[in-house]
A protein has these predicted regions:
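Secondary-structure capping and domain/repeat boundary segments
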Residues: 310-390
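C-terminal low-complexity, Ser/Thr- and acidic/Pro-rich disordered "stalk" regions positioned immediately N-terminal
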Residues: 378-408
Length: 435
């Protein structure tokens, strides 16, 4: 009995210790000054940081570990030049525990980044904010030499091998002369955005995001009112400019963005790298989209709402020729269309979907869609069977047969139609016309 009691006491103590340790680990380190924030980022024991007030920083914050930063509704602003945050290694997760806090910005127009103006700003932003970044030039060595990223990453710069996860908060009013006004993702960098907003940011290309690594946009991510101001060969994508691996899904939205290249106000996607693959599975794009298929088959589309059209995205439309229901059109690129449920039509049998109105060329649902197409339903008249309970002489009138008029017959002779029916015993019976 004593042993059992002692075991229970020890178990309780152990649970208390583990609970206390877990609580201590999960409690964020509170910061309200640049010094406190810089110190917390440099402390390897600190894995979670929470702002307790607005903080102005004079230099770029450098992340070299796995850490969560909670903006907590406050403003993190760089007063000097450079990126607000540079993720050198590890993973930075951005969250915001006070999304109802309100801040004001002024939109000066002419493709300029929004400016923090808490007194008279007309652009209202809900939640914590990262702002003021102007980008920088970064150099990295790899197996083939040195890579130079010029004047990029106004808000957050994601270095090769580093990761950025954005679940909440806002990146607003950041800029870069070359690329990635809001976020710059470098070769082998990784960016996942499932929440929060990137807005009022500008760059030569990729006003909101410039991706040369792997970027995933999903759920409630929003990119709005960003602009690509450059006119060079690589200056595309007011909202997003992607050259490598991009996945877009869920209810994410890109809206109100502009670009000097008017084909890509919302987004520009190409796959210039040999291993690059991009997939558009959802999202809403309120602005022109340009998918550059010069690298054949590397960009696929299976969903999404393209409000202002999209170059490189094709539509499969269905014409049921009187049948119901009418299937919804499908957005596709380099993927097969999904065969809809067969429509129905009174008095007819559905044969299949065809690419021409005359219904002579059947459509192959296993082949990838590489152009817009309208598919037509083909119908054949359903066979008719007649039954007459009386005994009538069949005149075998050939003209009547051609018109398809019903035949009467002796009920003892069976059905007048060459058909086969299986009895419950599996025996085949053939109905014949009586002579």
């Amino acid at each position: 009995m004593k042993r059992r009691f002692l075991a229970l006491v020890l178990a309780g103590c152990l649970a208390a210790v583990l609970s206390t340790a877990a609580w201590a680990t999960e409690t964020p380190t509170s910061v309200s000054t640049e010094m406190e924030l810089t110190t917390a980022l440099g402390d390897t024991a600190v894995t979670s940081i929470q702002l307790k007030g607005n903080i102005d920083i004079s230099n770029t914050l450098v992340v070299t570990k796995d850490v969560t930063l909670d903006l907590n509704g406050f403003v993190l602003k760089i007063t000097g030049s450079g990126s607000v945050i540079k993720i050198e290694s590890g993973t930075l997760t951005l969250v915001d525990s006070n999304p109802s806090a309100e801040h004001k910005f002024t939109n000066d127009g002419n493709d300029k980044p929004w400016r923090l103006d808490e007194t008279a700003g007309a652009e209202k932003v809900k939640g914590g904010v990262i702002t003021g970044g102007t980008g920088n030039t970064y150099k990295y060595n790899n197996d083939i030499g040195q890579i130079v990223y010029n004047d990029c990453g106004g808000g957050v710069f994601v270095a090769p091998g580093a990761s950025f996860i954005m679940e909440g908060g806002n990146i607003v009013g950041c800029s870069a002369g070359k690329s990635g006004g809001g976020v710059k993702v470098t070769n082998d960098g990784d960016f996942k955005m499932s929440g929060g907003t990137i807005s009022g940011c500008t760059a030569g290309g990729g006003g909101g995001i410039d991706n040369r690594g792997t970027t995933t946009l999903s759920d409630n991510a929003k990119i709005k009112s960003c602009s690509a101001t450059g006119t060079g060969r690589d200056d595309h994508g007011g909202g997003v400019c992607s050259y490598r691996n991009l996945t877009v899904s869920g209810s994410m939205v890109i809206s109100g963005c502009t670009a000097q290249n008017n084909k890509s106000y919302a987004m520009y996607v190409t796959t210039g790298y040999p291993d690059a693959r991009s997939s558009i599975e959802g999202g809403t794009f309120d602005g022109s989209v340009w998918l550059d298929h010069s690298s054949s088959g590397k960009i696929t589309v299976s969903g999404g709402t393209f409000k202002n059209g999209a170059s490189g995205v094709w539509t499969v439309t269905f014409n049921t020729n009187g049948g119901t229901p009418e299937p919804e059109s499908q957005i596709r690129a380099n993927l097969p269309a999904t065969k809809p449920d067969d429509p129905t039509r009174s008095g007819y049998v559905f044969v299949g979907w065809y690419t021409d109105e005359a219904c002579t060329a059947a459509y192959d649902f296993t082949k990838p869609v590489t152009d817009s197409v309208t598919l037509y339903a083909k119908w054949e008249a359903a066979p008719r069977y007649y039954y007459n309970s009386g005994t009538t002489t069949d005149t075998d009138n050939a003209d009547e047969d051609k018109k398809g008029s019903p035949k009467t017959f002796d009920p003892g002779a069976g059905i007048y139609a060459v058909s086969v029916a299986l009895s419950l015993t599996g025996t085949a019976w053939i109905g014949r016309k009586r002579h």
